[in-house]
Design a protein with these regions (language model features):
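A short aromatic-rich beta-strand->coil structural motif
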Residues: 6-12, 88, 100, 216-219, ...
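Non-transmembrane alpha-helical segments in soluble domains
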Residues: 11, 33-37, 60, 85-89, ...
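Active-site segment of extracytoplasmic enzymes that catalyze sulfate/phosphate-ester chemistry
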Residues: 15-99, 107
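Short, solvent-exposed loop/turn segments at the edges of secondary structure
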Residues: 54, 114, 333-337, 392, ...
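Catalytic-site neighborhoods of secreted/periplasmic enzymes
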Residues: 63-188
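C-terminal cap/loop subdomain of S1 sulfatases and analogous C-terminal strand-loop tails that border
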Residues: 126-129, 143-145, 315-321, 361-363, ...
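Active-site-proximal cap/lid insertion segments
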Residues: 2, 10-26, 137-356, 369-389, ...
């Protein structure tokens, strides 16, 4: 094979449930279908901490939150931890980051520096919308600058008070501008949007990388994360006859439900599900067009045959399923199951893989694609200042993408949340074990638990945790969760000092 390349596309808050509904006819998504036809769609891929920063840290490191330390929003990933971009950079690859990475807190800076993690080129724009994209809008599309400012929700960030080299007070300017809410169409053309700008920068990186130079291009889109704001003209590509209605909030009558559910339900009640889903699906259509541009750009650059394309999301969005919205510690399917598509040289085409995958599998998958040593799940990796590193939780998915399932492939994935934006109480901490046909979630401080037989109850409506007829089922799932916690909490002594026969 010629020099390999990797394009990693990370969508923000894109649930597998909604992409699959779109592909069944709810939205016009020819390029997602195109990528699925060129590779493998993993139908059971899970976010192991369904919130932005922790999930993205797991993608980068192959570790779960309890190992890499990014527990929730507001945490920064240590640049000392091994990452796939760092490994590829050390191996001589050109490494480019375009769009959203969110490995550091948004409030830290409008222009975060991700070069310490291993990127040699970066074009960053994230949720606060300041920085490179905003500066480009002002320079190239000044007629839309004020319209863009109306969509900035993080107006209280200090940097907006002394913005840019001229130290302009954009905060004062924005204070006089209306905000459009949480469901709207962008008040400027699609060509000016963050998503288009991110794709433009990625295409520039692909086109400008010299032939023969291996390229890693990570493309991070800010959408379809709320606010649900597609460009104008894309709602017409949504066929509402195929958009599913929200599943009922059966937890309201369940005494084992944690209190945090009520707080999030109060947020959800302010939204009308038809409007939310229509705008969300329209944003998927816009992202589909960006995917098509990326795939075409690889072909134009002569890199199509030698490039692994990996597309996934950090977590999902409930979109009013179960009377809830967004993500966090509500481990229903639309929150934790994410789309994952992988195509590349030597991989199966048009395949659907039902084996369990997790976002921490991306790290070893990229290393194997690059021909670099791939850590085993039981292999420690050195970290500066520490004699040993945490277990690598991920496994390469390339064997599955070739159509072969290893005999020792996992039978469960583990999901954790440590708090959410509604509360920091341990009662909102939750540990979940998810198998192919069951889910068990245990909340902290006795706040509640959930047990679902997904084969009989795919919509997760009947909590069996307190049902005496399912006591054995509950115990089996609790034991599976306990075994995971025992292994994950294995102490990290200085084993490099150990010598056989020394006590």
């Amino acid at each position: 094979m010629a020099t390999p390349n990797v394009v990693l596309i990370v969508y923000d808050q894109l649930a597998a449930s909604w992409l699959e509904a779109g592909l069944r006819g709810a939205a016009d998504l020819p390029n997602f279908a195109r990528l699925a036809g060129q590779g493998t769609y993993f139908s059971r891929c899970f976010s192991t901490n369904p919130v932005c920063s922790p999930a993205r840290a797991s993608i980068a490191t192959g570790l779960r939150s309890s190992a890499h330390g990014v527990m929730q929003l507001g945490y920064a990933l240590s640049p000392e931890l091994p990452t796939f971009m760092g490994a590829l950079s050390e191996a001589g690859w050109h490494t480019a980051a375009c769009g959203k990475l969110h490995l550091r807190p948004h409030w830290e800076s409008l222009e975060p520096d991700y070069r310490p993690y291993g990127f040699s080129e970066q074009h960053i724009t994230e949720d606060p919308r300041g920085g490179a994209w905003l500066d480009w809008v002002r320079a190239e599309h000044p007629e839309h600058f004020r319209a863009v400012l109306t969509t900035i929700w993080a107006r209280e960030m200090d940097e907006f008070s002394e913005y840019g080299p001229q130290r302009e007070n954009l905060a004062e300017l924005m204070a006089g501008l209306p905000m459009p809410g949480n469901v709207y169409e962008l008040p400027f053309p699609a060509r000016v949007s963050q998503s288009n700008w991110i794709t433009d920068r990625a295409l520039d990186s692909i086109a400008s990388t010299p032939p023969g130079q291996s390229l890693l291009c990570q493309i991070g889109y800010v959408q379809p994360h709320n606010p649900y704001a597609p460009p104008r003209g894309f709602r017409r590509f949504v066929n509402f006859d195929y958009v599913p209605e929200p599943v009922p909030a059966a937890w309201r009558d369940d005494p084992l439900t944690p209190p945090a559910f009520n707080a999030r339900a109060a947020v959800a009640e302010k939204h009308e599900w038809r409007a939310v889903r229509e705008h969300y699906f329209a944003d998927m259509v816009h992202l589909d067009r960006q995917l098509g541009r990326v795939l075409d750009g690889l072909a134009d650059a002569g890199r199509e045959r030698d490039t692994y394309v990996i597309a996934l999301a950090d977590h999902g969005d409930l979109l009013l399923d179960h009377g809830l919205i967004y993500k966090d510690s509500f481990h229903y399917d639309a929150c934790v199951r994410v789309p994952l598509l992988i195509s590349g040289p030597g991989l199966a085409q048009g395949q659907v893989c039902d084996d369990l995958a997790a976002i921490e599998d991306i790290y070893p998958t990229i290393l194997e694609a690059a021909g670099l040593p791939c850590p085993r799940p039981d292999e420690r990796r050195p970290v500066p200042g520490q004699p040993t590193a945490p277990f690598c939780a991920g496994r390469s998915l390339l064997e599955l993408a070739r159509g072969r399932t290893p005999a020792d492939w996992r039978e469960a994935v583990f999901i954790e949340s440590f708090n959410n934006l509604d509360s920091r109480l341990p009662g909102n901490w939750v540990k979940t074990v998810r198998t192919a046909d069951a889910r068990y979630s245990l909340y902290g401080e006795g706040a509640g638990e959930q047990l679902f037989d997904l084969a009989a109850d795919p919509d997760e409506q009947e909590n069996l945790a307190a049902d005496p007829t399912h006591r054995r089922f509950r115990q089996q799932m609790r034991d599976l969760l306990l075994q995971h916690l025992l292994v994950e909490r294995y102490p990290h002594p200085p084993r490099d000092l150990f010598r056989l026969g020394v006590h």
